[in-house]
Amino acid sequence: MRIAICEDEEFIQNSIEKNVEKCLEITGMAGKCECFVSAEELLEKGNMPYALYILDVEMKKLSGLELAEHIRTEDRNAVIIFMTNHSEMMQKAFDVQAFQYLVKPIDSDTAHNVIMRALRIIREKRNYIRFTNKLKDMIFYYDEVECIESRRRKIIVHTEKRDYEFYGSLSQIEAVS
């Protein structure tokens, strides 16, 4: 499982990352955190999609809420947790189906409980297929895939929203159930 943490304050970012790693260890789930200091960095360097996004609401250029809107255009099933200093922004988080909204300063036990609940939900969610090639790691949920075909060293995944085409072979499929 891949987890994105987008937080511009290094201390908070490190604290959340350690908490996530502890929760992964407790649940026995395999996972990897990737940390970003801005929404732009996540969009540019991140290998989306991620199963879990932990986002700071207030960032310099692109806010966590704007980033979440972008995430929802690509992945309606990801779990999103917001962090912020301002509880009055909580209502906007519901527009992007946020899982939880943490108000800073974040108590370590509260963060731990929220992350544990999020991981349980992810584990209980639907099954998915993962394709891995040199450029990208792509996850497709079973109920979104209409058909998968292989043609001339290319894999074409037909989904509800669009078709994805990339070089690879069917042997690169990892079905996770």
Enumerate the predicted regions with their spans.
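Non-catalytic signal-transmission and effector/linker regions of two-component phosphorelay proteins
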Residues: 1-4
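Conserved acidic carboxylate
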Residues: 7
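Charged phosphotransfer/docking patches of two-component systems
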Residues: 10-17, 90
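Short hydrophobic/Thr-rich beta-strand motif most characteristic of the beta2 strand and flanking loop
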Residues: 24-38
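Short alpha-helical segment
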Residues: 36-43, 173
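Short loop/edge segments at beta-strand edges and connector loops
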Residues: 37, 103, 168
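CheY-like receiver
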Residues: 41-44, 50-124
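Conserved binding/recognition cores within well-folded domains
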Residues: 113-177
